[in-house]
């Protein structure tokens, strides 16, 4: 028996490779599937099944392409209604994989079709639970994503409680838990940084599995403090349900080297967005006018999904050398399939062609402190709501302007004003500054090091509130 977790940090997502006697099952594959095929071929094994725990919202799964390339069967739990060929399993249905068995446990709540997959060893002993977004380590999946018709988030939360109590808690303590996500995912509120656990420990430490918790208490607690989902979640879920373009075609389309003239022509004629994915320090030093910064050194794909509202948006890339294919791949993981190419030679090519270059003013926390004390300045704190509430600068002209909702809140800022922008460490503030600049805000200043550096000055702060109490 082979079980491999294939974890993708940028998405905080775990896919799984299971092998027994030459037969392979893949659970929740990523969009690019060649790695799974290569693993199986290396072991002279054949991919037999592709198990999907639900219609994922935070990434585009590779189930459709993997099935086309291997002939493997796609399997969903009860009530799933995909627009492609798949086996819709019954609750408790068992699938044979070599000497192993995989049992479908229908666990509605995160979504109505959500299911866990219980792996039994060759002695038919419960060995591992592939829990999808039903159970994370330290948390459970948010129950607000699949509301429709007369099914409310409270209904879904109630279903989730019953699924956990009737299908998960009843399993033995030594069952290994393999969740679909870890810390950093927006599919839950407080996921552990660990990506593999044991069910007995979760019964002791996970608030959602407390033995003394009533259904009403669970519903209240699991819904408390859930931030609105990123705008791309519903769109990715629909792609996973309806099907999508072949990843190989998407990569071929986007992996095109363009000289400065062709790059500029495409930007103008195709209304393409110029996306600069270099490190923020490089963007600060020089960038193409009206380009947007979202660096691949940070939470790239989720921020793209949160901020670029049209999945069909034509995109042109400015990347670090050698990162072109990786960038196209990471865009496709969240459904952005319309990359038209990249600037060959990067920003140096643009400069050599005599094209216009802009910079972003960036100052130290110490310099910012002097301005804050001696002038009336406008400060934008672009951190998340919980970060801001925990502690922030205390001042009349300090404005919370969360990057997550910058598109919705543009009317809260004035293009005639000068804004000093900070986040926690200096990544998100540059994203926000680039968006504002592209929309005609000519006077934006980044505070290098963000709130982490500002805290080391003597500027006034609000009293710290532990985030766990918010």
Indicate where each model-derived feature is located.
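Conserved beta-strand hairpin/beta-sheet module of binuclear metal-dependent hydrolase folds
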Residues: 1-46, 117-132, 137-138
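Divalent metal-coordination and catalytic microenvironments
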Residues: 18, 28, 54, 66, ...
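Active-site neighborhood of phospho(di)ester-bond hydrolases with catalytic His/Asp-centered motifs
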Residues: 26-27, 47-56, 74-79, 106-109, ...
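Active-site metal-binding loops of divalent metal-dependent hydrolases
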Residues: 29-30, 55, 79, 111, ...
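Active-site metal-binding motif and surrounding structural segment of the metallo-beta-lactamase
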Residues: 33-75
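Metallo-beta-lactamase
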Residues: 101, 111-229
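Rhodanese-like catalytic fold shared by cysteine-dependent sulfurtransferases
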Residues: 142-144, 150, 201-238, 242, ...
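Short, well-ordered beta-to-alpha junction loops that form the rim of enzyme active sites
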Residues: 179-184, 189-190, 235-237, 277-279, ...
């Amino acid at each position: 028996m082979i079980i491999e977790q294939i974890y993708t940090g940028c998405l905080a997502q775990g896919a799984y490779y299971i092998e027994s006697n030459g037969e392979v099952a893949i659970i929740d594959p990523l969009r690019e599937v060649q790695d799974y095929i290569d693993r199986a071929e290396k072991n002279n094994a054949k991919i037999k099944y592709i198990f999907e725990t639900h219609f994922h919202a935070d990434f585009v799964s590779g189930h459709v392409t993997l099935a086309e390339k291997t002939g493997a069967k796609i399997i969903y739990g009860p009530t799933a209604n995909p627009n492609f060929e798949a086996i819709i399993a019954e609750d408790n249905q068992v699938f044979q994989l070599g000497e192993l068995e995989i049992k479908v446990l229908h666990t509605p709540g995160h979504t109505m079709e959500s299911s866990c997959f219980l792996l039994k060893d060759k002695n038919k002993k419960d060995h591992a639970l592939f829990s999808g977004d039903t159970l994370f380590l330290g948390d459970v999946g948010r129950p607000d994503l699949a509301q429709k018709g007369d099914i409310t988030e409270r209904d879904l939360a109630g279903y989730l409680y019953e699924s956990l109590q009737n299908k998960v808690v009843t399993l033995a303590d030594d069952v290994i838990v393999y969740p679909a996500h870890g810390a950093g995912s927006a599919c839950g509120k407080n996921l552990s940084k660990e990506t593999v656990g044991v069910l007995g420990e979760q019964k002791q430490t996970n608030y959602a599995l407390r033995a003394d918790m009533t259904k009403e208490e669970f519903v209240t607690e699991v819904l408390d403090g859930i931030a609105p989902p990123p705008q791309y979640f519903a769109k990715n879920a629909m792609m996973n349900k309806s099907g999508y373009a072949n990843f190989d075609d998407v990569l071929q389309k986007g992996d095109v080297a363009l000289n400065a003239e062709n790059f500029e022509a495409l930007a103008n004629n195709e209304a393409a967005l110029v996306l600069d994915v270099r490190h923020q320090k490089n963007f600060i030093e020089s960038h193409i006018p009206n380009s947007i910064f979202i660096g691949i050194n940070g939470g790239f794909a989720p921020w793209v999904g949160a901020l670029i509202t049209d999945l069909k948006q034509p995109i042109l890339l400015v990347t670090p050398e050698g990162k072109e294919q990786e960038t196209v791949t990471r865009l496709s993981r969240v459904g952005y399939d319309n990359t038209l190419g990249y600037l060959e030679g990067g920003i140096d090519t643009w400069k050599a062609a005599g094209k216009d270059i802009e910079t972003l003013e960036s100052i130290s926390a110490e310099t910012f402190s002097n301005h804050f004390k001696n002038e009336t300045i406008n400060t934008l704190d672009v951190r998340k709501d919980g970060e801001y509430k925990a502690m922030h600068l205390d001042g009349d002209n300090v404005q919370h302007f969360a990057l997550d909702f910058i598109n919705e809140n543009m009317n809260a800022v004035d293009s005639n004003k000068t804004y000093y922008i900070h986040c926690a460490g200096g990544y998100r503030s540059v994203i926000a500054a680039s968006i504002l600049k592209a929309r005609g805000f000519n006077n934006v200043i980044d505070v290098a090091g963000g709130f982490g550096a500002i805290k080391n000055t003597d500027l006034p702060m609000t009293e710290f509130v532990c985030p766990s109490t918010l």
